[in-house]
Amino acid sequence: GFGILRYNTMLTVKPAAVAFANMVNNYRYLKPIGKYLAKDRKTYGFIYENEKESGAPVLSIWREADEKEELIPVKYTKSLTGVDIFGRTIEIPIIDGMAHLPLSMSVLTVSGFDMDDLKNLYEPKEQY
């Protein structure tokens, strides 16, 4: 059937319902501030400020196709946490000053960045 519930005796939710609930949970306090400047033309992303957490930056990032690791140089960031569309969290490894983000066609929401590490990695919203 159509919709976000399966038509069975339990009315179980479909994956889209879980993804939507997680999207609302992860993005409801975020204000977009710019477009991520990816090195690869098949990688897309946006930078947000979390208004609930004093403007802490959040990166939303994904690939058009395939899977690939995105390396982001970080000097001030100490740890990063990624959340997939189903709400599963992963610790993003930082090795020798590079954050290693595992990308796929599914959106990864990454928090924990120091804004000084992102300031040259996005195009401000008013410019696009």
Q: Predicted regions span which residues?
A:
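Hydrophobic alpha-helix feature that most strongly marks membrane-spanning transmembrane helices
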Residues: 25-28, 64
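Carbohydrate-binding surface patches
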Residues: 38-78, 85
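Short, hydrophobic/aromatic-rich segments at coil-to-beta transitions
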Residues: 29-34, 56-58
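C-terminal beta-strand-rich structural cap/linker in extracellular carbohydrate-active enzymes
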Residues: 93-128
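Surface-exposed loop/edge segments in extracytoplasmic proteins
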Residues: 87-93
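Hydrophobic, well-ordered secondary-structure elements that form the walls
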Residues: 20, 59, 110
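Aromatic/acidic polysaccharide-binding cleft in carbohydrate-active enzymes
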Residues: 1-25, 34-41
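Short beta-strand micro-motifs in enzyme catalytic cores
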Residues: 1, 9, 44-46, 57, ...
